[in-house]
Amino acid sequence: MKVIEGGFPAPNAKIAIVISRFNSFINESLLSGAIDTLKRHGQVSEDNITVVRCPGAVELPLVAQRVAKTGKFDAIVSLGSVIRGGTPHFDYVCSEMNKGLAQVSLEFSIPVAFGVLTVDTIDQAIERAGTKAGNKGAEAALSALEMINVLSEIDS
């Protein structure tokens, strides 16, 4: 029986991080966690990491699609945070963003790691951006690294 599993080291990988500016006080912590993880666990050179900023979470799928279309990257890490308010806007944003990012991954056959917080409160966002509940940006970076290696193994 052959089992395919990906590790984390991917020293030659080219990674794009697409990040929304809205709620930047949270997102910058996610970005720090992602970059640290790519460098420490993935052994990815800083020269091979490109950060692309966009206004908000709704724009992430289009930016990810354009990045994927270039063919220059082995994976995309999407980062942002959507915090529930008093209207149904949260549900629409989260649903469409999630669908859009998944579509990019399938359309271009590239890992698009999901590091976008979808939370009810600012406190929950803070907890998931590097305090009590870990750093979801770092976790998304690990997922991207592992998927690069899994897909490489499948293709070899």
Curated annotation (Swiss-Prot):
<dbReference type="GO" id="GO:0009231">
    <property type="term" value="P:riboflavin biosynthetic process"/>
</dbReference>
<dbReference type="GO" id="GO:0009349">
    <property type="term" value="C:riboflavin synthase complex"/>
</dbReference>
<comment type="subunit">
    <text>Forms an icosahedral capsid composed of 60 subunits, arranged as a dodecamer of pentamers.</text>
</comment>
<keyword id="KW-0686">Riboflavin biosynthesis</keyword>
<feature type="binding site">
    <location>
        <begin position="57"/>
        <end position="59"/>
    </location>
    <ligand>
        <name>5-amino-6-(D-ribitylamino)uracil</name>
    </ligand>
</feature>
<feature type="binding site">
    <location>
        <position position="114"/>
    </location>
    <ligand>
        <name>5-amino-6-(D-ribitylamino)uracil</name>
    </ligand>
</feature>
<dbReference type="InterPro" id="IPR036467">
    <property type="entry name" value="LS/RS_sf"/>
</dbReference>
<feature type="active site" description="Proton donor">
    <location>
        <position position="89"/>
    </location>
</feature>
<dbReference type="InterPro" id="IPR002180">
    <property type="entry name" value="LS/RS"/>
</dbReference>
<keyword id="KW-0808">Transferase</keyword>
<comment type="pathway">
    <text>Cofactor biosynthesis; riboflavin biosynthesis; riboflavin from 2-hydroxy-3-oxobutyl phosphate and 5-amino-6-(D-ribitylamino)uracil: step 1/2.</text>
</comment>
<comment type="similarity">
    <text>Belongs to the DMRL synthase family.</text>
</comment>
<feature type="binding site">
    <location>
        <begin position="81"/>
        <end position="83"/>
    </location>
    <ligand>
        <name>5-amino-6-(D-ribitylamino)uracil</name>
    </ligand>
</feature>
<feature type="binding site">
    <location>
        <position position="22"/>
    </location>
    <ligand>
        <name>5-amino-6-(D-ribitylamino)uracil</name>
    </ligand>
</feature>
<dbReference type="Pfam" id="PF00885">
    <property type="entry name" value="DMRL_synthase"/>
</dbReference>
<feature type="binding site">
    <location>
        <begin position="86"/>
        <end position="87"/>
    </location>
    <ligand>
        <name>(2S)-2-hydroxy-3-oxobutyl phosphate</name>
    </ligand>
</feature>
<comment type="function">
    <text>Catalyzes the formation of 6,7-dimethyl-8-ribityllumazine by condensation of 5-amino-6-(D-ribitylamino)uracil with 3,4-dihydroxy-2-butanone 4-phosphate. This is the penultimate step in the biosynthesis of riboflavin.</text>
</comment>
<feature type="binding site">
    <location>
        <position position="128"/>
    </location>
    <ligand>
        <name>(2S)-2-hydroxy-3-oxobutyl phosphate</name>
    </ligand>
</feature>
<dbReference type="InterPro" id="IPR034964">
    <property type="entry name" value="LS"/>
</dbReference>
<dbReference type="GO" id="GO:0005829">
    <property type="term" value="C:cytosol"/>
</dbReference>
<protein>
    <recommendedName>
        <fullName>6,7-dimethyl-8-ribityllumazine synthase</fullName>
        <ecNumber>2.5.1.78</ecNumber>
    </recommendedName>
</protein>
<dbReference type="GO" id="GO:0000906">
    <property type="term" value="F:6,7-dimethyl-8-ribityllumazine synthase activity"/>
</dbReference>
